[in-house]
Amino acid sequence: METANIYRLNRDRPAASPAAPTAKPTSSPQKPKLLDQVRQAIRTRHYSYMTEKAYVGWIKRFIFFHNKRHPAEMGEAEIAQFLSALAQEKHVSASTQNQALNALLFLYHEVLGKEIGYINGVVRAKRPIRLPVVLTRQEVRSILGCLDSSDWLMVMLLYGAGLRLMECLRLRVKDIDFGANQILVRAGKGDKDRHTMLPAAVKEPLAKHLELIRRHHQRDLERGLGRVALPNALERKYPNVGKEWGWQWVFPATSHYIDKVTGERRRHHLHESVLQKAVKEAVRKAGIFKPASPHTFRNVST
């Protein structure tokens, strides 16, 4: 037998000295799961946490819609089926359907490295034709009279400075120039920076608000906290800048969160739902029967 021949050949050879124990080959690091790859790709590009949450959510729904098939095995046809089902069965809005599409295109282009061509046969969600809600100046005054402190300040900035809701919430202390009566809006619509005026009516209450926020920030620093997330690559270049007063949020959240990358406790800006709920309640208290939202005040301003 062949095995026996090999055995005899080995016996005829001189005995070899004992070999030094060889190190076990190190196993290559396990490839991250798909959704973790998506999260990492989003964070590398410095997208917002809201975008990360939305994209991961849509990708999960896409996978479950196709009975947990891996996206690498699917393509244009499966994307079209999913998007059409959103319009026909879930009756989502056109903007929601577009967000789902953007999430899937990000998955294929940026994570899987797979080009997606023209997606045929998608049933498009209908764009509702709605007239903008317009408030009279008296209605605005009535609503403002039903708002408290920071909610009042935020609405005044939407109304007087023409800020969008998220532009207001993302304001940093350094963006307010009291001397020049200006506000710097960073990465606004179209990812562009712009200046807008600081309304005279809010200068004094805003200064008092910031003094209160400064005291809260000082207490955070004393507890070893006080860091906020920074845009782009600033955090890598200047590790301690995130604790500086100028980079703090004008409208910070009341609680901290755990940064998923660093594990550090940080403070984010207020969630948009805080002002949305406050405005809804103020409209009700003012006895106004219009579907007004924070964005409505910007329409009045412009």
Which residues does each PLM region occupy?
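Conserved catalytic core of the tyrosine transesterase superfamily
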Residues: M1-T302
